Amino acid sequence: AVPPDMDGKSLLKLVQGQESEWRKYLDMEHATCYSQDNYWCALTDGKIKYVWNFHTGKEELFDLRKDPNELVECSGKPAYATQLKEMRQAMVDHLAERDETFVKDGKLVVRETTMLYSPNYPQTK
């Protein structure tokens, strides 16, 4: 058991393949610390990966089951329209907790500014 004063959750059920209340998506983000053009956020459930490019609004969708190396971008393919819509909504839900510079009126917002570091990064405090 996880001690009550320890932050986090036990991964035991997850690694044993048992039913577990765990988040549905893994979040990935890239800031502009290396390149001004490389500012995005992505969500994946391990089967599908959705990428939202903050500065351009470009969406990318990859079918990781068929294309684990992400060589075929599927956002414009009619066969993936439902998955694109679902993943876009998941990103809206994910980013909505931040502020209106990320999501406004239920839609993703193209950002003109960037953050080089997380708000919790020691240099920003």
Residue ranges and their predicted role:
Residues 1-60, 64, 82, 98, ...:
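C-terminal cap/loop subdomain of S1 sulfatases and analogous C-terminal strand-loop tails that border
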Residues 13, 73-76:
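Phosphate-coordinating loops and pocket residues in cytosolic domains that bind phosphorylated ligands
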Residues 67:
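Intrinsically disordered, low-complexity polar regions and short flexible loop motifs
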Residues 77-81:
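Short, conserved loop/turn and helix-capping segments at secondary-structure boundaries
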Residues 90-99:
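A short, conserved beta-to-alpha structural element at the edge of catalytic cores
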Residues 123-125:
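Basic/polar N-terminal segments that are highly enriched at the extreme N-terminus
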